[in-house]
């Protein structure tokens, strides 16, 4: 039966008995933290709450970095930023987190690491990971609005790999369309063509969304003629797909954006 360490720690914290709470928290981590990852995460978060009450921002940041190493994600990255900003060390921490995602080097083992030990056992590198963690690097580049880095890591993706966990190619194209409109158009076209290749009416409807996005960008770049030529090439390549022809009829020969009066 799972021991109720989280409830005990919460009661002790509510009573202001923080030393006892920390003692039982660490006991719980030693006892069941690895067997029950969810409980372990809850106990570590309770320690983070204690350090926040103490306004011990360097340790709060160190704990948050450990969360990020265990489960890299954009939200965890932002939590690292919040705590590290309070500690006045975000630029160094940011570089170390990105280096971890790229090289697999644990942040606290890197030269010049600015944060203290958290007081808990630090996680090891997950051996299932294959660095660089391209999806996470793309996600953070989108978060930081760095389209050049989005493209850098998008181009680093494994061949034939079209999905990045929760990050879709539509989000990638949207993130880079102002910086590199031709790349955004190419991504949307590729998405549409892969959907068309499924030879399913539902996929055609999905494809048209990406075709419209590509067409809008081409129109703003005064490439309406090229857009029409592209649609005509699709018609010739897929002339037997009647439902697709109907959809393309709704696109071809019509400006994607209304002309200004």
Question: What positions do the PLM features span?
Answer:
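Eukaryote-biased, non-catalytic alpha-solenoid scaffold regions
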Residues: 1-261
């Amino acid at each position: 039966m799972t021991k109720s360490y989280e409830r005990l720690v919460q009661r002790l914290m509510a009573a202001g008995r923080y030393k006892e709470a920390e003692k039982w928290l660490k006991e719980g981590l030693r006892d069941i933290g690895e067997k029950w990852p969810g409980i372990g995460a809850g106990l570590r978060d309770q320690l983070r709450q204690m350090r926040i009450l103490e306004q011990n921002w360097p340790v709060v940041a160190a704990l948050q970095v450990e969360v990020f190493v265990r489960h890299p994600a954009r939200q965890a990255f932002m939590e690292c930023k919040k705590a590290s900003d309070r500690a006045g060390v975000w630029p160094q921490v940011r570089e170390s987190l990105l280096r971890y995602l790229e090289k697999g080097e644990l942040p606290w083992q890197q030269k010049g690491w600015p944060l203290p030990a958290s007081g808990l056992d630090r996680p090891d590198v997950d051996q299932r990971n294959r660095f660089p963690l391209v999806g996470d690097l793309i996600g953070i580049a989108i978060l930081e609005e760095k389209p050049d880095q989005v493209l850098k890591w998008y181009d680093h993706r494994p061949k034939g790999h079209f999905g990045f966990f929760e990050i879709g190619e539509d989000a990638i194209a949207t993130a880079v369309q102002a910086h590199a409109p031709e790349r955004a158009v190419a991504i949307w076209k590729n998405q549409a063509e892969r959907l068309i290749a499924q030879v399913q009416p539902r996929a055609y409807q999905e494809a048209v969304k990406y075709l419209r996005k590509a067409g809008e960008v081409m129109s703003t770049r005064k490439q309406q003629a090229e857009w029409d030529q592209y649609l005509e090439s699709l018609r010739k390549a897929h002339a037997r797909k009647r439902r697709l022809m109907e959809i393309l009829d709704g696109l071809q020969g019509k400006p994607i954006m209304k002309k200004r009066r």
